[in-house]
Each structure stands twice: as C-alpha cells, then as structure tokens.
Amino acid sequence: FWVQTNPGTRPGPMMKVASGGELSRFLLALKVVLSDRGSAPTLVFDEIDTGVGGAVADAIGARLARLAGKVQVMAVTHAPQVAARADQHLLISKAALDKGKRVATRVEPLANEHRREEIARMLAGAEITKEARAAAEQLLKAAG
C-alpha cells in the first residue's frame, strides 16, 4: 500500500512512510472492514496499540470493544486503556525453568481486585501506588 500520512508530503510505501501508531490504526481499520464482511469469527490483535499514546489507546480500546459485539476479539496489549475495556482479562507471564534451559508460559484469568491490580501495575510499573490504583479503578468504571 502507498500512503500519504500528512498533507504536503509525498505518498510512499506504507512500511517506510507510516509510523508504528499509524500502522497499528491501519491494521485495526482493515480488520474492522473485513469483519463487516464476515471474514472471520475471531480476530487476533497482537499489540495493536504499539506506538500510540493514552488517548489513541483509549480510542483503540473503544473500537475493539465495539468490534467484540460482532466477533470474538483477542488482543495482546500493554496499554491499560485497552485492557480495561475487555470482557475477560488474562495475564500472560513467562518464567525460566531448569536454570534457564526452558521457559514456561502461564495464562491466568483475572477478576475484580486482581484485574484492578494488574491495570494499576500496567500504569505504574513494579511499585503500585494508591494513585495508580485509583486511576485503574477509574479506567474500569469508564469502560463500563
């Protein structure tokens, strides 16, 4: 695809011209259009929010939530704005085993308090503050 991302610039190949955020939004738009045509009952988005800020991540989360009304949506995200809008939240983690010779992946469903704590961790990092918990609670309330 050739795109023109800003007025006054020349069109060019999307992979060279578009930013990470622009590529993410294009992929989301493309999958939305394809889902309207009944192309797949499940859509998987792997870090669709890469390279975007909080407001755009919130808009992506809202669009994914609307899309989930039509098809099953699975999204891997590091954005708390996206995670807060999910119907189900799974925490995926990896751990080294056998002194680093093997890796095990764990998938843990989160509910209520654990979900709020994970969203707070996504916001604050390793040290979760009361402000991060309050912000996580606000994101969950806003998401409905």
Please tell me what each predicted stretch does:
Residues D46-E47:
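Walker B catalytic acidic pair
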